[in-house]
Amino acid sequence: MTKQILYQENARKALEKGIDILAEAVSVTLGPKGRNVVIEKKYGPPQIINDGVTIAKEIELEDHIENTGVALIRQAASKTNDVAGDGTTTSTVLAHAIVKQGMRNVAAGANPIALKRGIDKATQFIINKISEYSRPVEDNKAITQVATISSGNDENIGKMIADAIEKVGREGVISIEEGKSTTTELEIKEGMKFERGYISPYFVTDSDRMEVVQENASVLITDKKITLVQQDLLPVLEQIAKTNKPLLIIAEDIEKEALATLIVNKLRGILNVVAVKAPGFGDRRKSILEDIAILTGGQLITEDAGLSLDKVDLSMLGQANKVIVNKESTTIISNANENNVKARCEQIRKQIEITDSSYEKEKLQERLAKLAGGIAVIKVGAATETEMKDKKLRLEDAINATKAAIEEGIVPGGGATLVHLANDLFNWAKGVLKEDELIGALIVEKSITAPLKRIVQNEGKNGAIVVDEIKNLDFSIGYDASTSKFVNMYESGIIDPAKVTRSALQNASSIAGMILTTECLVVDEMNRNMEVRK
């Protein structure tokens, strides 16, 4: 296919057109009075969306040149979403503002490379200031406020996420499922859960719920296949029978003959036992079994450690406060050795840091979450499929923002933090930078007021007036667009995670700098005649 090549100002202007289109479509959703965007779907009903990155992903323009601009600015939103999970609209608005200001200066003769250096230095200055001003999240109230703001000011969602984090811990898993009613509900699943159920229904102790429930159980954990009870398990089973304690057996597999012996002993009341297959596959299976051993304070019976089943004694077994096994899953609730569990969690965190594989990272995070604090499931309720999708997107944003706040702290929201830091940036840049680098820094100084201006504009008022007013007020004071008043943002609960604000600016300035230093654009040339014939 033939290519179309554009140079210098023509290339930058062509990109700017696409950027303008995407930025306008996304920025209408910003703030408490932001509007929704309706997206036509090829299959199924149209989708009503208030989420910046989802809108950005859906926009494809017919003009290849303009579409390149869309794709570039989309990167800022996507990267912010990957890192912080929220702030995608803010990132798009910031990138658009920096590009617009930068284009004017490049057209007036400024050196794009020097401008980019100034933009990068100014961005780093602001990032350091955000870190300096951020407050740690210390209580449930702050978590509720962050989640409420990020979910589109839905207080019920905010409280639900705060409750979930309180119950499963700050590293616990919060998953979202489609509910079966019109109300959104929170369900907490305590302890460590893995997706393996009982091998036989004959182990069931609660026939109404078809579950095995054991209190104060011993846990035998092995990566071996159990073939014969007499050969493999008899010594330990005799010891367990004397204690009258229930027994959970987790093994690679249990052969029919061994399984039959266990069931007979269970039905005769000699032994309260349940057997499940080990979760996972390959090396991951062994790691998960080691996690379970650490959680319960037991030992993994494996030949690698020189241990065999016929030599097992009671001291090698784990202990669980409660075990619940159904057809599909096993839940172990145990607080046998908290210090060892914490050490294991730290070890998994280090593995997460050094691994490059996103799949491996995801699996390690799952293991960490299961060890660290259990699972919270939010069952989303809605009257229609369209509402369901919108609610799920808002919930995802809220959960991500909350975790980001816990990680790096909080700052005043509603665009106020960046407006307050504009004065600091101006004074610093004037004293440190010169010529085109200074112009680059001042581009950032003007651009970081854009999110607040857009929030006020979406409310139907003049953003420039509000920005000038806020610059002269205390750092904690900002503009509440829902009430049109200047308020203490911390007291009013209008707060943003520092990580979201930082990531939004970092990714916006990175992409904008790349666009400003573009001198040539090569795209596929559209065949106009072919388009007409179609």
Curated annotation (Swiss-Prot):
Task: Give the matching PROSITE patterns.
Answer: CHAPERONINS_CPN60
Q: Name one GO molecular function term.
A: ATP binding
Reactions catalysed according to its record: ATP + H2O + a folded polypeptide = ADP + phosphate + an unfolded polypeptide
Question: Per its UniProt record, what InterPro entries does this chain match?
Answer: Chaperonin_Cpn60_CS, Cpn60/GroEL, Cpn60/GroEL/TCP-1, GroEL-like_apical_dom_sf, GROEL-like_equatorial_sf, TCP-1-like_intermed_sf
In short, the EC number is 5.6.1.7
Chain residues that bind ATP: 29-32, 86-90, 414, 496
GO CC aspect terms: chloroplast
Q: Which UniProt keywords apply?
A: ATP-binding, Chaperone, Chloroplast, Isomerase, Nucleotide-binding, Plastid
> Where is this protein found?
Plastid, Chloroplast
Domain of life from the UniProt record = Eukaryota
State what this protein does: Together with its co-chaperonin GroES, plays an essential role in assisting protein folding. The GroEL-GroES system forms a nano-cage that allows encapsulation of the non-native substrate proteins and provides a physical environment optimized to promote and accelerate protein folding.
Family stated for the protein in its record: Belongs to the chaperonin (HSP60) family.
Oligomeric form and interacting partners: Forms a cylinder of 14 subunits composed of two heptameric rings stacked back-to-back. Interacts with the co-chaperonin GroES.
Q: What is this protein called?
A: Chaperonin GroEL, chloroplastic
